[in-house]
């Protein structure tokens, strides 16, 4: 109740939101057999960090010296870009949202060619559009980082049978033979 009252100052609006929360929560409890839908543990009294995978990728990139990121938002990779945007000043990074994925990869190639530690982030459908720019990076021997947030199936949504289609696409993306390094983390440590 305290969180809802803090968010909604008007008593009438606060009461309506508390009622809506209780109804929704009750439906969730009934649906999963009497246990809460989501249990958030108390904050531990230590230096542990609680964050999602996209934030971890963004922090890792910033720690590695990434100082330029450009992207066209595409879930599930958008979180990396928005985390960078929110912390651009802290990371001393240039953050640029562009009109499409083709522009994003070409700007990353240009920035890297000029000496920036540059990256972009996307998902399968956006990565398909980046393949020609990836070929440009290959022919000019310009190192770029593309965060490809893998979807659970061959397109947006959840397929009947899941697969690693985005990873398969990344193995052979671009024209011609040039070196590629693919990293697919399997747990928090990697």
What are these regions (language model features)?
Residues 1-53:
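Aromatic-enriched
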Residues 4-9, 42-46, 68, 98, ...:
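Conserved short loop/turn motifs at secondary-structure junctions
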Residues 5, 33-46, 61-66, 83-91, ...:
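Gly-rich Lys/Arg/Thr-decorated short loops/hinges at beta-loop-alpha junctions or inter-strand turns
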Residues 12-19, 125-128, 189-190:
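Active-site glycine- and acidic-residue-rich loops that bind
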Residues 30-33, 56-65, 110-112:
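Glycine-rich phosphate/diphosphate-binding loops that line cofactor/substrate pockets in enzymes
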Residues 47-76, 82:
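Glycine-rich phosphate/diphosphate-binding loop of Rossmann-like nucleotide-binding domains
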Residues 68, 75-172:
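Thiamine diphosphate
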Residues 161-190:
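Conserved thiamine diphosphate
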